[in-house]
Amino acid sequence: MNLISIPAFQDNYIWVLSENNGRCIIVDPGEAAPVLAAIEENQWQPEAILLTHHHQDHVGGVKQLREKFPSIVVYGPAETQDKGVTQVVGDGDRLSILGHDFSIFSTPGHTLGHICYYSEPYLFCGDTMFSGGCGRLFEGTAEQMYQSFMKINALPEETLICCAHEYTLANMKFALSILPDDRDINDYYHKVNELRAKKQKTLPVTLKNERRINLFLRVNDIDLIDKINKETNLQHSVARFAWLRSKKDDF
C-alpha cells in the first residue's frame, strides 16, 4: 500500500493508505475539502474511514465524505458513535480492509476512548503519540497515557508512527529545554528544524527514532531521572511521565 499524508487546518495530517488500483482507506478526516481534492486528483475510491477519537479536527469531514461515498464504512471507538461511525470497534478487535489486517488497541489519555490502528508497519495513533511528544491529557490521566505509550513501545522498532499533527519542532524545542546536552535530541532537533524551514514534513517516523528522542518514552533513562531529581524526587515512572507532561503544558 502507498502511504500519503494530506495537510489540513494549521498542522493536522489526514493519512491515506491507497492501493495501486485506487482503492483507499482514510484516517481521521477532520475536514472533507482537502480529502475530496486528493480523491479527485488521484482518482481514489474510498473504501473505509478509521477514526481514533471524537475530537472535531479528526471527525469533521466524515459526514460530507459519507454523503459523497454512501457505501464507505466508518470505523471508530464508542466515543465517536455520533460522529458518523457505521461500525464501532475497540480494544482487541481486528479488521481486514483491502486485504490488510488491522489490530486495534485502546490508548486512553488524550481522550478516554482513544484507540490506535496497527497494520504492519503503520501505526495510526491519532493524538496519543507525537514525534518527540505526547497528546494533552484532556480526559485521561498520566497513568493511562503512560500505559498507552507502553503498548506502542511494545511494537517492532521499524513501526512507522503516523501521528495526526506536525508538532515535531515544538516538541524537540521542549526536549532540548529538559536535556540540552543530549546528542540524539540535538541532532534530531537540527534535522527537524531544517525540514520545517523548507516546509517539509517530519512524519511518519520510526518507533526506533522515538525511543531515542521522545522523552515520554525515556522516563526510565538515567539522564532524565537525574534531571528530574534536581527539581523533585520522583521514584515512579508514571510520576516522571506526569512531571514531563506538566512541564510541556507550561512550555
Curated annotation (Swiss-Prot):
Pathway: Secondary metabolite metabolism; methylglyoxal degradation; (R)-lactate from methylglyoxal: step 2/2. Zn(2+) 2 binds at D57, H58, D127, H165. Its EC number is 3.1.2.6. The keyword Zinc applies. Binds 2 Zn(2+) ions per subunit. InterPro entries: Clx_II_MBL, Glyoxalase_II_hydrolase, HAGH_C, Hydroxyacylglutathione_Hdrlase, Metallo-B-lactamas, RibonucZ/Hydroxyglut_hydro. Its cofactor is Zn(2+). It comes from the Bacteria. One of its GO terms (molecular function) is metal ion binding. Keywords: Hydrolase, Metal-binding, Zinc. Zn(2+) 1 binds at H53, H55, H110, D127. SMART domains: Lactamase_B. It catalyses: an S-(2-hydroxyacyl)glutathione + H2O = a 2-hydroxy carboxylate + glutathione + H(+). Gene3D superfamilies: Ribonuclease Z/Hydroxyacylglutathione hydrolase-like. GO terms for biological process: methylglyoxal catabolic process to D-lactate via S-lactoyl-glutathione. It is an enzyme of class 3 (hydrolase). Belongs to the metallo-beta-lactamase superfamily. Glyoxalase II family. PANTHER family: HYDROXYACYLGLUTATHIONE HYDROLASE, HYDROXYACYLGLUTATHIONE HYDROLASE GLOB. Thiolesterase that catalyzes the hydrolysis of S-D-lactoyl-glutathione to form glutathione and D-lactic acid. Monomer. This is Hydroxyacylglutathione hydrolase. It comes from Klebsiella pneumoniae subsp. pneumoniae (strain ATCC 700721 / MGH 78578). The gene is gloB.
